[in-house]
Curated annotation (Swiss-Prot):
Domain remark in the UniProt entry: The presence of a 'disulfide through disulfide knot' structurally defines this protein as a knottin.
Recorded family membership: Belongs to the neurotoxin 36 family. 02 subfamily.
Signal peptide span: 1-20
Disulfide bridge partners, by residue number: 39-56, 46-59, 55-64
Name used for this protein in its record: U2-theraphotoxin-Pc1a
Subcellular location: Secreted
């Protein structure tokens, strides 16, 4: 009887941990905090300030290169 109880608890633990992993993966995909980084392509004007979007390359003479 004790062996069946230990086996039952082990199965519940495995099922619970796999469900936790699945839900953790789903949470990270649905999270609004994880956003795709945006950048300006070459030729666009570099914008300074708090709401600026960085260049994909570098900013030279107010143009993205």
């Amino acid at each position: 009887m004790g062996f069946k109880l230990v086996l039952f608890i082990a199965v519940l633990t495995l099922v619970g941990s796999s469900n936790a992993e699945i839900s953790a993966k789903m949470d990270s995909r649905d999270s609004p905090m994880i956003q795709e980084r945006r950048c300006l392509p070459a030729g666009k004007t570099c914008v300074r300030g708090p709401m600026r979007v960085p260049c994909c390359g570098s900013c030279s003479q107010n143009k993205c290169t």
